[in-house]
Structure formats: structure tokens, C-alpha cells
A protein has these predicted regions:
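A short, glycine-centered helix-capping/turn motif at helix boundaries
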Residues: 32-46, 150-153
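Catalytic-site neighborhood detector that most strongly recognizes the C-terminal catalytic loop/helix
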Residues: 3, 66-68, 103, 161-197
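Acidic, low-complexity interaction regions
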Residues: 91, 112-113, 154, 179-214
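Short, polar N-cap/turn motifs at the start of nucleic acid-interacting alpha helices
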Residues: 51-55, 152-175, 195-208
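Conserved tyrosine-mediated DNA breakage-rejoining catalytic core shared by Y-recombinases
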Residues: 8, 36, 45-85
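Active-site/catalytic core of tyrosine-dependent DNA strand-transfer enzymes
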Residues: 9, 77-131, 213-214
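Basic, Lys/Arg- and aromatic-enriched nucleic-acid-binding interface segment
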Residues: 1-40, 140
């Protein structure tokens, strides 16, 4: 996968600039992805019970995934805290996202609709040529790059992204127990996207107060 540039990601998000519930849902999903590095199905599967305070820090608690390492706690970035709290206040059958609540598949995936919408928006914003490797998972790739550039220890990046790191189970268990939500929150706060924050008027008071002009 290839990470989006800030400009490219803003162009994709601006495809969802209308005021419809569907556009708002996609913007919210994408912002959570950009400020956490979570997988698209992890985000779509979030319920109100997965957003909780742990040791005084508002976090996403991811309880299931492909591997044992995927189960983890990811602090909520201050810039999307109002957005996340508003989603938690108005759930859809317990889920943060409406289209996840109405998607039931044998494989348990809740993100089918969101994946399709994101792919269409990317093609509309950036075209098809040369963008094949830029998908929703690229947000996760970008988060890993940003954390690495900020010289965050590899085992901490692995904890935040739910990667398996280290040669032994003992190493991972120790790391998980040693990293407090307060420590992890400091790393999450390093994730910043100046062009996107300016283009979408994202701030700590209001995350979806968009400018009317693209």
C-alpha cells in the first residue's frame, strides 16, 4: 500500500462534502482512520461499549481481530474527541455507524459499504491511473509512517496498530502491560494533518464544521 499525501486525502474527503447522513458517516469513519490507524472493519465494528475511559483517557477498545495482537486499546485523538462522543451519543442498534448496523455477513465484516464508498470517492478525486495502491488501508500505512518519523519506539507503534512484534509472546505481553493509555495518548497526539485540518475546519470544539467551498 502507498500512503496518501495530505493533499490527496483532503481531495478524497471533499468528495463527501455534502451534508447528507451518508457523507457525514464517511467523513467520520475516515477521520477515525487517519487519527488512529485502525483497520476499516475495526472502525465499522465499533459499538458504544468500545468507546470508554481507561485510566482517565478516552479510548477505543478493540476486542477482536485477526490475531491476538489485534486486540488493543487506542486513545482517541483530542481533535476527534467531540466527533467520537457525538457518535456514541446517537448509536444505531449499539453501533457508531448506521451502515455497519445494517450489514450482516457470514464473515462478520461490517465495512463492505464503507469500503465501496471510499474506493469510489478515491477514483473520483484522484482518478484510477496510478492510484491502485492507495486504498483505505493506506491511512493505516500513513499513521505508521508518521509515528516512525516522530521516532516512536517500534514496539509502541505495534501496540497502537495491533501488529505482532518481537520474537516471543513474552515480549508482546510485557510491552502491552507496560504501555499506559496516558503514554499511548501522547503518541496519538503526534498525528497531525495540517492541510486536512484547515480544509475541513477541524478543531477540538467541532470536527465536522466544514467550509462550504472545496
Amino acid at each position: 500500500y502507498e500512503a496518501f499525501s495530505n493533499k490527496e486525502l483532503l481531495q478524497v474527503l471533499q468528495v463527501f462534502s455534502g451534508n447528507s447522513a451518508e457523507n457525514k458517516e464517511m467523513i467520520a469513519l475516515c477521520l477515525i482512520g487517519a487519527y488512529t490507524g485502525m483497520r476499516i472493519n475495526e472502525i465499522a465494528s465499533l459499538t458504544i461499549d468500545d468507546v470508554k475511559e481507561i485510566e482517565g483517557v478516552l479510548c477505543f477498545e478493540i476486542t477482536q481481530g485477526k490475531t491476538k495482537a489485534a486486540a488493543r486499546v487506542v486513545p482517541v485523538h483530542s481533535l476527534i474527541t467531540p466527533l467520537v462522543l457525538s457518535l456514541r451519543e446517537k448509536p444505531h442498534n449499539g453501533f457508531l455507524f448506521y451502515h455497519a448496523s445494517i450489514t450482516e455477513r457470514a464473515d462478520g465484516k461490517r465495512s463492505t459499504w464503507h469500503t465501496q464508498r471510499f474506493t469510489r470517492a478515491k477514483r473520483k478525486a484522484l482518478g484510477e491511473k496510478g492510484t491502485e495502491r492507495k486504498v483505505f488501508h493506506s491511512l493505516r500505512h500513513g499513521v505508521a509512517q508518521l509515528l516512525d518519523r516522530n521516532q516512536i519506539p517500534e514496539d509502541r507503534i505495534a501496540l497502537l496498530l495491533g501488529h505482532t512484534r518481537g520474537n516471543t509472546e513474552t515480549f508482546r505481553t510485557y510491552s502491552k502491560n507496560a504501555a499506559s493509555p496516558v503514554e499511548l495518548k501522547n503518541y496519538i497526539e503526534l498525528l497531525r494533518y495540517p492541510e486536512i485540518e484547515k480544509g475541513l475546519s477541524i478543531n477540538k470544539k467541532s470536527n465536522l464544521r466544514r467550509k462550504t467551498t472545496p
